[in-house]
């Protein structure tokens, strides 16, 4: 999991995914079509995103999303492993965090599934 802390409060957490797997890209596009506001290709907002909660609930997983102004959040990257387990390739997660004062930081995580 990825721990996020913002002393000034969290305004936005966007998660963008890319992959060398065409099947993964296709799966992400399918998710975007079925869950409004869950477009990981363009970047999905996590803060307050109840559709993301519904998506992971439909996958049998629990996900809590932060509210705007929260100062901490643990992004459960492991929840995505269900999607990745059968899709070989290099999968990249880019997290962009913006605080309430407009300060922005990016983080990158690459997972390789063989």
Kindly label every feature range from the protein language model.
Residues 1-114:
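First exposed extracellular module after export/assembly in secreted or surface-exposed proteins
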């Amino acid at each position: 999991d990825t721990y996020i802390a913002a002393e000034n409060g969290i305004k936005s957490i966007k998660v963008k995914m890319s992959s060398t797997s065409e099947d993964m890209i296709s799966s992400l596009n399918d998710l975007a079509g079925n869950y409004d506001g869950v477009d990981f290709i363009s970047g999905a907002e996590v803060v307050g995103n109840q559709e993301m909660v519904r998506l992971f609930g439909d996958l049998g997983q629990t996900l809590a999303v932060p509210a705007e102004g929260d100062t901490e959040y643990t992004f459960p990257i492991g929840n995505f492993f269900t999607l990745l387990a059968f899709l070989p390739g290099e999968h990249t997660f880019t997290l962009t965090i913006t605080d309430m004062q407009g300060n922005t930081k990016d983080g990158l995580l690459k997972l390789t599934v063989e």
